[in-house]
């Protein structure tokens, strides 16, 4: 018997944050342990806007939205931990950017036939 597939965490995070605009999401680490029915994915969220203040506000809004994920049963997210940030980290060309890193734990669910 195989464990059910785990949800795509990057996709879950992106779907929640995409309407904020100026958001990029990528996983930089992941891990699962026996019996492989849950996984924790480390996600980095880069937040861009036209000014430092707008970027700051958007980053903290993104943080709040991610912390609400475990309370949405449809999300399959069991836990969100802030790993670092939001922190000011402008692009090399000086463009405004805040970076937020979170650990998102998900659980696989078998579909009932």
Model-predicted segments: where are they?
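Charged, amphipathic alpha-helical segments and their flanking helix caps
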Residues: 1-23, 27-113
